[in-house]
Design a protein with these regions (language model features):
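Alpha-helical segment of the N-proximal tetratricopeptide repeat
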Residues: 33-59
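Terminal, low-structured helical/coil segments at or just beyond the last alpha-helical repeat
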Residues: 168-214
């Protein structure tokens, strides 16, 4: 499942949120216009209009103590808009709290957090987020996370773990062949696997695998 599609998982809860006022732990006696602003932000988020949603969420975040779910929404918006540092700023603190949500909703936040750290080349921070996502996502969503984990370990020159994750990613891609450009991805993974095997074989060439993670 593509990241954009994955991010919509768990948003069925918004239907009930749209009819509610700002939660008690956000504020008391909220003015009506801010309730409307929250409703609009949620509607934009649900419609994948992340830029518009983020503008409204930021304004609310400046004025109220938003709950953990809304902060996670802000983090997801930032991730979708390539604002990776800000995404981590919002998502990192709420990760311990997302375990109370439905598994697939958790996977949305873990993936957005992991990808944000990955894009910032913070591979050690990305690894546990990808691993937690693997525990709660559907099987047909695991390939991308396994693929990224392969690169996380490769960049750390942990060839054995990189090899294991690349091989697992290839198996999942082959089984759930849904991804656009799958043939090119599989060819790349094959090259990465061969490169990692050369690194783990003392009798083989010292050539390193390519570090292109697209």
């Amino acid at each position: 499942m593509k990241p954009k599609r994955c991010l919509m998982i768990g948003l069925a809860t918004l239907a009930s949120l749209l009819g509610q006022s700002i939660p008690a732990n956000a504020t008391l006696n909220s003015p009506v216009n801010d309730k409307d602003r929250l409703s609009m932000a949620l509607e934009y988020f649900q419609s994948e209009k992340y830029r518009e949603a983020l503008l409204l969420f930021r304004k609310l975040d400046q004025e109220y103590l938003l709950n953990q779910r809304y902060k996670a929404y802000i983090g997801v918006c930032c991730y979708r808009l390539w604002k990776y540092e800000e995404a981590c700023m919002y998502l990192d603190p709420v990760m311990p709290s997302v375990t109370v949500y439905a598994p697939h909703e958790q996977s949305v936040y873990y993936y957005a957090n992991a990808e944000s750290h990955f894009q910032l080349k913070q591979y050690q921070a990305a690894i546990p987020c990808y691993e937690k996502m693997l525990n709660v996502c559907h099987d047909n969503e695991k390939a991308d996370a396994l693929y990224r984990l392969g690169f996380c370990y490769l960049f750390r020159k942990d060839w054995e773990n990189a090899l294991e994750y690349f091989e697992s990613a290839r198996a999942y891609y082959q089984h759930y062949g849904y991804k656009a450009g799958l043939r090119q991805r599989l060819e790349q993974i094959g090259n990465m696997i061969n490169g990692c095997k050369r690194q783990t074989d003392p009798t083989a060439s010292a050539a390193s695998p390519s570090d292109s993670a697209k």
